[in-house]
């Protein structure tokens, strides 16, 4: 982070703009909106600046820049077309420890003016640290279209309610009130239509509702790793959670979307190494929900595909704890797509099977004759430890040794690696990758030669 985002209170505080052209006009308009005491220093001024000066909105010093003008200033903006003057302003401001913005010169800025979306008192500021101002403006236009005008009124209303809401003794109940207020569709419509009386009645209803927090658990699929594959609903749940209980397979990029003041509890486990037993996880979810918290149980991939999500929900259902499920993109879909391997294809596979590499006893017990039939795709989850057994059983039951296979390590992530070869090499190929890895078996693997769009540089051919 090159610049810390910071909103400054400049009301009635002296600031200086060096320059009198169109850029100075734009900067002065922003500072006047912030109610700053603006001084313009330039020998010649744009008509708009002269007009503001005549109205008494700003002060003019019609002379060349001299360092004494910086005395007592909180901020200075250099907006001249003379690089040597801008450099002098920057040097003198730095010497006095005054924030300085030199227009179109990021290297000479101790402060950056962002692209702004104004829904006062709600403000959204976007900055590229001066490296791509046009990109910041384009993002502002996109976000501007998403934010309704009444958000400013809603923020003002929230400010008026702060003291009343502080009187609610329970911290979680206070946060629940704010969540209901900001997502209240009827209130939003009333504010947008200017129906102030009706809006106040809606707020009164919310304040009079029982404030007792009722806990619940939401089972959320985090997807296979790439945070861009997290669903919109999943993202919303992470932003609303009081507690997030997560597994080893959840990427740091996904965890970065968790609400900052939410408690994070790691319960990671892998085959043969359960740092937190499943029963303890079930009990943890119960305890947190009974405390009135909104709990997110975050699992890699999809929680209902080899994720033991069903077992956890059974425990919650038996205890009468409210729960819901947000599906995720399962590892088979994500890893195959990011490896250029379509799981089904009319010329190759009319069926796909997802198979766990080990059951709850740690064994791999399968209907091998059914798995060894042609024109299908097999996807083994958690199968690395049994790669040799998978190879032997499939070949023994009739699947040719030349059947293409792929092992996808860290699928969909920047670290993704794909090792491809033949079924008769599977045990050997498994030594070239680490967990978490997925095994894909079937002729669809050959299509990766043409369809690999994501990780060509990280794809290895089998021996």
Curated annotation (Swiss-Prot):
Sorted alphabetically, which keywords does the UniProt record give? Cobalamin biosynthesis, Lyase, Methyltransferase, Multifunctional enzyme, NAD, Oxidoreductase, Phosphoprotein, Porphyrin biosynthesis, S-adenosyl-L-methionine, Transferase
Q: Which residues bind NAD(+)?
A: 22-23, 43-44
Return the annotated region ranges for Precorrin-2 dehydrogenase /sirohydrochlorin ferrochelatase: 1-203
Pathway named in the protein's UniProt entry = Cofactor biosynthesis; adenosylcobalamin biosynthesis; precorrin-2 from uroporphyrinogen III: step 1/1; Cofactor biosynthesis; adenosylcobalamin biosynthesis; sirohydrochlorin from precorrin-2: step 1/1; Porphyrin-containing compound metabolism; siroheme biosynthesis; precorrin-2 from uroporphyrinogen III: step 1/1; Porphyrin-containing compound metabolism; siroheme biosynthesis; siroheme from sirohydrochlorin: step 1/1
What Gene Ontology molecular function terms does this protein carry?
A: NAD binding; precorrin-2 dehydrogenase activity; sirohydrochlorin ferrochelatase activity; uroporphyrin-III C-methyltransferase activity
Q: What is its EC number?
A: 2.1.1.107, 1.3.1.76, 4.99.1.4
Q: Which residues carry this modification: Phosphoserine?
A: 128
Q: Where is this region: Uroporphyrinogen-III C-methyltransferase?
A: 215-463
Which Gene3D superfamilies does its entry note?
Cobalt-precorrin-4 Transmethylase, Domain 1, Methyltransferase, Cobalt-precorrin-4 Transmethylase, Domain 2, NAD(P)-binding Rossmann-like Domain, Sirohaem synthase, dimerisation domain, Siroheme synthase, domain 2
| Pfam families in alphabetical order | CysG_dimeriser, NAD_binding_7, Sirohm_synth_M, TP_methylase
Which GO BP terms sit in this record?
A: cobalamin biosynthetic process; methylation; siroheme biosynthetic process
* Binding of S-adenosyl-L-methionine, residues: 224, 300-302, 305, 330-331, 382, 411
- List the catalytic residues: 247, 269
Q: Which PANTHER family does the UniProt record give?
A: SIROHEME SYNTHASE, SIROHEME SYNTHASE-RELATED
Family, according to the entry, reads as follows:
In the N-terminal section; belongs to the precorrin-2 dehydrogenase / sirohydrochlorin ferrochelatase family.
Its recorded name reads Siroheme synthase 1
Q: Which organism is it from?
A: Aeromonas hydrophila subsp. hydrophila (strain ATCC 7966 / DSM 30187 / BCRC 13018 / CCUG 14551 / JCM 1027 / KCTC 2358 / NCIMB 9240 / NCTC 8049)
């Amino acid at each position: 982070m090159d610049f810390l985002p910071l909103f400054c209170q400049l009301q009635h505080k002296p600031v200086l703009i060096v320059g009198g052209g169109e850029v100075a006009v734009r900067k002065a308009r922003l500072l006047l909106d912030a109610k700053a005491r603006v001084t313009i220093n330039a020998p010649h001024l744009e008509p708009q600046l002269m007009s503001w000066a005549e109205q008494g909105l700003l002060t003019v010093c019609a002379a060349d820049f001299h360092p004494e003008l910086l005395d007592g200033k909180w901020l200075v903006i250099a907006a001249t077309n003379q690089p040597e003057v801008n450099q002098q302003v920057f040097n003198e401001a730095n010497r006095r420890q005054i924030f300085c913005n030199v227009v179109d010169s990021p290297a000479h800025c101790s402060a950056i003016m962002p692209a702004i979306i104004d829904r006062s008192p709600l403000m959204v500021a976007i900055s590229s640290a001066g490296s791509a101002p046009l990109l910041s403006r384009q993002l502002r236009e996109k976000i501007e279209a998403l934010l309704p005008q009444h958000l400013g009124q809603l923020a003002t209303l929230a400010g008026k309610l702060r003291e009343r809401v502080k009187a609610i003794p329970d911290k979680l109940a206070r946060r629940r009130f704010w969540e209901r207020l900001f997502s209240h569709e009827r209130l939003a419509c009333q504010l947008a239509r200017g129906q102030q009386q009706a809006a106040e009645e809606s707020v009164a209803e919310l304040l009079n509702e029982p404030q007792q927090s009722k806990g619940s658990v939401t089972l959320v699929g985090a997807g296979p790793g790439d945070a861009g594959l997290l669903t919109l609903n999943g993202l919303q749940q992470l932003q609303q959670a009081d507690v997030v209980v997560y597994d080893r397979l959840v990427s740091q990029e996904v965890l970065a979307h968790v609400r900052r003041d939410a408690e994070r509890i790691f319960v990671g486990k892998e085959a043969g190494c359960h740092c937190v037993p499943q029963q303890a996880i079930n009990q943890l979810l119960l305890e947190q929900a009974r405390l009135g918290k909104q709990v997110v149980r975050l699992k890699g991939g999809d929680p209902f595909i080899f994720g033991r999500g069903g077992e956890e929900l059974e425990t919650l259902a038996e205890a009468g704890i409210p729960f819901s499920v947000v599906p995720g993109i399962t590892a088979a879909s994500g890893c195959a797509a990011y490896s250029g391997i379509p799981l089904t294809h009319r010329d190759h596979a009319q069926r796909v099977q997802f198979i766990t590499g080990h059951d709850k006893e740690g064994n791999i017990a399968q209907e091998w004759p059914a798995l060894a039939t042609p024109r299908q795709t097999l996807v083994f989850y958690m199968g690395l430890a049994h790669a040799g057994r998978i190879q032997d059983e499939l070949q023994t039951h009739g699947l040719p040794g030349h059947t293409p296979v792929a092992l996808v390590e860290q699928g969909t992530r920047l670290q993704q690696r794909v090792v491809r070869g033949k079924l008769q090499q599977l045990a050997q190929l498994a030594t070239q990758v680490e967990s978490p890895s997925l095994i894909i078996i079937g002729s669809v693997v050959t299509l990766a030669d043409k369809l690999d769009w994501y990780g060509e540089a990280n794809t290895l051919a089998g021996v």
